[in-house]
């Protein structure tokens, strides 16, 4: 796009909380947008409140009338839970562009078995998988098909009764199956090893636009040890508009007829595992992601135009900053994480030095001019640079400037699982 899709100052409302919402707000504001945020949960309000006006869902149960009143030009959801809100249809009927697919297209992420069936239909490699309604059915399936399985909720949502449990042996799988909530059943997916990677692109105007290849460090501790955390502890991002690793060609391009059939327009992420020289789909998502999104907005030269163009289902021209082709994300975790039932004290958070890259506050609050930890994930440090090595070094340089008693961060981002396909 040689000209902006919005000649005036575009008004953008983010739906979300925490560092992910704050990052989108600041990055888009820096590119000329007027930003605000609809806070969708009870926590993580501090970061967005520093970047623009906020509305709290408990005080404003339906944001659509205010969106119309304010003349909002674009809505950017951080999660798919907007699609189950009571005001979803009113938002869709309003005509306000949304950076998200809707209707059947949303099922690509929402319904894990729907994604599996799509892969089967279009010849895309997918691990052995099964939806079980209760423990007996799940147990019997594993006994009949003795492999380690990843246990997921069949329906993807932030409040799902089952959060992803990665089992690396048959015995681990059988043990965990005794301890999960079967209120929505379980989705069992063959464990494919640790050689995972992801790619995020945009679908717009009936075409797929490759964007970035990314790695998420999902386990809590160095050496990829400990449990899979509720959100990654770090990540790497590489601008990849030419599909350097073939993920778009193998795992997204075959879905192009379906994208067009469902009028899909929005972000799409595929997470895949490499086995025997072949990429297998693990899951699809329809948002920019908690680790990649904040870096992506900095890596693009024209993020406002890109976001508006995709939301309007137009052809787009993505332009990356050549000096920001690589990104690194680090999470500062607080007392008790990733064991979220452990509640820590009300500890102070101090920034000891001027940041030289983005620091986005997550579960913190302010009182009497001081900042305090209010949850388990304190901050996300996001860097972008001209090389991966420089991006990693910049992120580590800045996370050291944050102090909170008993907090921690991973020290080994980039030392494994990169480049894509590495152990």
What are these regions (language model features)?
Residues 373-423:
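Generic C-terminus detector
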Residues 180-185, 192-239, 248-281, 285-292:
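Phosphate-binding core of ATP-grasp and ATP-grasp-like enzymes
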Residues 1-102:
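ATP-binding N-terminal substructure of ATP-dependent carboxylate-amine bond-forming enzymes
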Residues 53-63, 129-134, 165-168:
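Short acidic-hydrophobic, aromatic-tinged amphipathic segments that line or gate anion-handling sites
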